[in-house]
Regions:
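Conserved G1/Walker A P-loop phosphate-binding module
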Residues: 1-106, 122, 133-135
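Short intrinsically disordered coil segments
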Residues: 56-60, 111, 330
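Long, charged N-terminal accessory/stalk domains
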Residues: 68, 80-185, 196, 228
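Amphipathic alpha-helical transducer elements in NTP-driven molecular machines
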Residues: 43-50, 63-66, 80, 84-91, ...
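Conserved nucleotide-binding/hydrolysis micro-motifs of P-loop NTPases
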Residues: 25, 48-50, 73-76, 98-104, ...
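C-terminal-of-GTPase-core extension/linker across diverse P-loop GTPases
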Residues: 2-8, 12-13, 19, 139-346, ...
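Short, glycine/charged-enriched secondary-structure capping and boundary segments
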Residues: 22, 82-84, 108-111, 210-212, ...
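Generic, low-specificity signal for short hydrophobic/alpha-helical stretches with a mild N-terminal bias
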Residues: 35, 51-54, 103, 115, ...
């Protein structure tokens, strides 16, 4: 699945720092607005289950699930067209907003208000979608006769128009299945799954609060957008440490896990993706599929021959393996099971496909 997440927001909010944390790409950051270059790189999705399997099998190769991440240049005056064009190319949106204070990194709006900044970026996306809706409605009404599929599309567009004019993204629009199909090709921006990441400073991290938090949470909640906080400055320090030092640092800071892990996992989830796992001495690997994928289709992710010659999927629940610590013990207790081609693969299933070609 070649799916992409776009980091969007105003300039100087920490998008490129977050991009580097997700991808280890080492893209250049700066203390001034005006970047026009789009950064693109792959981000591995942290998965403790895969780490456990690696400890069990000591494989020659370790392959986590991955997503492509695009660092879109910040939305600034005069950059609207380029910004919107870049947003059209991604499958999901991560709105990065700034709550951190800094004397060296100026805010483009001169004062901090992450709720306002989020709303302003959203407004650009809503306005762009509204223009698409209005243009298409004008073309439909200019036609001689409106019937059949066009009638369905017109009704869908009118619902979309009402949603957008109310300041809501189209992912919240109340459209029937056939109505979504009728407008799918229009490439709406506010249909894309979204996530908000608030970049806070170290003091705010310790205080567990930031300015305008209630307003931002209220705005996001009304639009069913999850909100995560991350202190990119601290996360950069964490990323620079060796594994043993990292554990001590996290414990001293009273952080359960690096915030960047939560962001990566949330990106994956917002795209409706899950992972099934394969494990052995050669490789432990997380395979990316959409939630609801049947076993035979999942087998095709590993190899087309396995899908073609699919017989059964030998499935082990990760929690059972983690609890018992040994695949042999899982089988002894009758907890390994054989599933057919229609079995819906669950997140974290450890699968060995039986096939014949």
């Amino acid at each position: 699945l070649a799916l992409t997440c776009g980091l969007i927001g105003l300039p100087l909010v920490g998008k490129t720092t977050l991009f580097n944390l997700l991808t280890c790409a080492g893209a250049e950051t700066s203390n001034f607005a005006g970047r026009t270059k789009t950064n693109v790189h792959t981000a591995g999705i942290p998965d403790a289950r895969l780490d456990f399997l690696a400890g069990l099998y000591h494989p020659r190769k370790y392959t986590p699930a991955a997503l492509e991440v695009i660092d879109v240049p910040g939305l600034s005056r005069g950059s609207g067209a380029a910004f919107l064009a870049a947003v059209r190319e991604v499958d999901a949106l991560i709105h990065v907003v700034r709550a951190f204070r800094s004397d060296t990194v100026l805010h483009v709006e001169e004062n901090l208000n992450p709720a306002r900044d989020l709303e302003n970026v959203d407004a650009e996306l809503i306005l762009a979608d509204l223009q698409v809706v209005e243009t298409r409605l004008e073309r439909i009404t200019a036609g001689k006769k409106i019937k059949g599929e066009t009638l369905v599309e017109q009704a869908a567009l009118q619902r979309c128009q009402a949603t957008l004019e109310a300041g809501q993204p189209l992912r919240e629009a109340d459209l029937a299945g056939e109505e979504w199909q009728a407008v799918r090709s229009l490439g709406f921006l506010t249909v894309k799954p979204a996530l908000v990441v608030v970049n806070i400073d170290e003091d705010q991290l310790h205080q567990s609060s930031y300015p305008f938090e209630a307003e931002l949470q209220q705005y996001a909640s009304a639009r069913n957008i999850p909100v995560l906080t991350i202190c990119a400055q601290v996360e950069t320090e964490i990323a620079s440490l060796e594994a043993d030092e990292r554990s001590s640092f996290l414990e001293a800071m009273e952080i359960a896990e690096p915030g960047i892990n939560r962001v990566a996992q949330a990106m994956y989830s917002r795209l409706g993706l899950i992972s099934f796992l394969t494990a052995g001495e050669d490789e432990v690997r997380a395979w990316t599929i959409r939630a609801g994928t049947p076993a035979r289709t999942a087998a095709g992710k590993v190899h087309s021959d396995i899908e073609r010659g699919f017989i059964r999927a030998e499935v082990v629940n990760y929690d059972d393996l983690a609890r018992l610590g040994d695949l042999g013990k899982v089988k002894e207790k009758g907890l390994a099971r054989l599933e057919g081609k229609e079995y819906i693969v669950q997140d974290g299933d450890i699968i060995n496909f039986r096939f014949n070609v």
